[in-house]
Amino acid sequence: MTFRFSARCRLIKRFLLRLLLACAVLWGGGVALFSIVPVPFSAVMLERQLGAWLSGNFHYIAHSDWVGMDEISPWMGLAVIAAEDQKFPEHWGFDVPAIEKALAHNERNENRIRGASTLSQQTAKNLFLWDGRSWLRKGLEAGLTVGIETVWSKKRILTVYLNIAEFGEGTFGVEAASQRYFHKPASRLTAAEAALLAAVLPNPIRFRADAPSGYIRSRQAWILRQMRQLGGEGFMRANQLH
């Protein structure tokens, strides 16, 4: 009995190691490939689509249209940086002071969890991983973040982020969002429109750009102020992000 149990444990360990190796090869290949190739779909898009089908919702379609940075208004990149990660051009994938503040806040407020994910971390998660707060997913996210920060430029990270971010039910990427909410291409987004889209990013299922609540309007105004304080379009040029 003991021998059989030990043999079974060895088989499980071997299987898990092979699975981990296969995932590492797959993710490493993805990091290298998507440094130059447009992203056709993300893990979050796949998760949303499969979830809809499994729940019997066959009308749901995860929609995205890839566009290059030269086809995206500079206001949009500036808006998500102002809203989500103002140290994006400076850090190496992680904002350590923000993480420390979030940990301290979460210890005091267990019912109001605050995140500190950078745009790089969000890109890694959205592109390759699943939703959740497990330590396993966080560990994989950290490794993938280091990978994309090593291989990709900051401009590339921002481009991919803007193309796979979720802006509403079935709406992924800034081009699809711009067409849905403003009926025009992402290249023509104004500062106010970009700030409105960025305002829903913390929870694009709960918050809506086409029916913004008072909270979203106040968040939009805050983002616009932050965009001005960062330096407007000049910030994007100075940091070679557009």
Curated annotation (Swiss-Prot):
Gene3D superfamilies for this protein: Biosynthetic peptidoglycan transglycosylase-like (1.10.3810.10)
One GO CC term on file: peptidoglycan-based cell wall
Annotated TM spans: 19-39
Main enzyme class: transferase
Any one GO molecular-function label of the UniProt entry: pentosyltransferase activity
Top-rank lineage group of the source organism: Bacteria
Membrane-related topology note: Single-pass membrane protein
Location relative to the cell: Cell inner membrane
Enzyme Commission numbers on file: 2.4.99.28
SUPFAM superfamilies linked: Lysozyme-like
One Pfam family from the record: Transgly
Function of the molecule: Peptidoglycan polymerase that catalyzes glycan chain elongation from lipid-linked precursors.
PANTHER family linked: BIOSYNTHETIC PEPTIDOGLYCAN TRANSGLYCOSYLASE (PTHR30400:SF0), MONOFUNCTIONAL BIOSYNTHETIC PEPTIDOGLYCAN TRANSGLYCOSYLASE (PTHR30400)
Family (UniProt): Belongs to the glycosyltransferase 51 family.
Name the record gives this protein: Biosynthetic peptidoglycan transglycosylase
